Amino acid sequence: MAMSNLPRDLLEEVLSRVPVKSIAAVRSTCKNWNSLTYGQSFTKKLYGKTMATKEKEFLVVMTMDLEVYLMRVNLHGIHKDDNNVKSSIMQKAKLIRLNDDRVRVDDICKVFHCDGLLLCITIGIRLVVCNPYCGQTRCIKTRRDYHITDNYALGHEKMKNSPLRNYKILVFHDKSFLQNSWFEIYNFNSDSWKVLYFTCDWKLPFSQLVVSLKGNTYWFAREMYIHGPRIDLPDFLICFDFTTERFGPRLHLPFHSRCVDTVTLASVREEQLAVLFQDSKTLILEVWITTKIEPNAVSWSSKVFLEVNMSPLTGFQFNRSFGSFFIVEEKNVVVVPIKGGHFKRNLAYIIGKDEYFKEVDLGVPSSYIYFSPHVCSYVPSLVQIKKDAQVMLQHHNVSAEKHHEFCASL
């Protein structure tokens, strides 16, 4: 049987064994193979072949002191041997800028992830999209001057009868006391912006409380209160659907938080959404995971994933405005990055049941008090973007020229 006649699943299995550096040649062979290699199913197979040999390892993206790092996480055996904790979260690569002053990937204050692409927001409010796995970047020309408090999101439109995806960027300013507002959408395919107006009865407390899932973006939101500040307002999730280019209805949460409490979002396996809630009075931390999440509907697990009293462990509340976390389901733990050591160190707390609590130094000294470390999930992708310049991953203790070898080992 000819390769072109193989079932799609079998063809993906065969082509996923091709080295990463040869994928370009595969794509140029025929239209069918080119289309297939852009699909998430193929990417997962390609990535899974490498990671299957690495004992429960996975990657996350961390922003620390205005720089972006890929961190390799391996919590295998942490409960058995606490000596392994120091090496459980290790820096593997750093995003660096090469030979092009038009595209700066340093001084990055915010990063948003979708399908292996990173939307980086710089201190100077420049928008740069990069695929660190492929070493590509795209500098996005904006319509106007944006502000650090604007809300940003990266997602994709679902294309009918095609595995290809049309990626988009959403930017909007949450005017706390105005119901009539607008947002801007950048379309990668047309390289253009458009402005849409909408009416809302909610506000976003903090622009970092956001996660991309299945191409759509979810925010933690509160009901708008026009007549002044209140400490106790209805809270919920709001989704922006990049296919319809509309915000969805309010999605209920499994708890109620006050404005002084901590609420943070994270993705789980790129399929479900997790929410961390910490009461500011009791310091009790709860983590909940969805069983279904769509732009117009959500359901939650009947049992809390993790519940821990942080009062005897840390004695303080996690960051409300720039907090982040990720979970490791098989270990029943959450990992929360923080500023520690009188704001001189970037740390991560590993928190589990029965008061399991460990501290890991992330290996990047802290120089900026006001920029807490921020983590988001990361799954390598072969999504191609029209590039302006080449941005590489600087492997920890390895020269930048080793980029291709490092990509193959991700």
From Swiss-Prot:
Domain spans labelled F-box: 1-46
Superkingdom of origin: Eukaryota
Name of a matching Pfam family: F-box
Signal peptide range: none
SUPFAM superfamilies, A to Z: F-box domain
Stored InterPro entries: F-box-assoc_dom_typ1, F-box-assoc_interact_dom, F-box-like_dom_sf, F-box_dom, SCF_F-box_component
Name of this protein: F-box protein At5g36730
Species this protein is from: Arabidopsis thaliana
Organismal lineage: Eukaryota, Viridiplantae, Streptophyta, Embryophyta, Tracheophyta
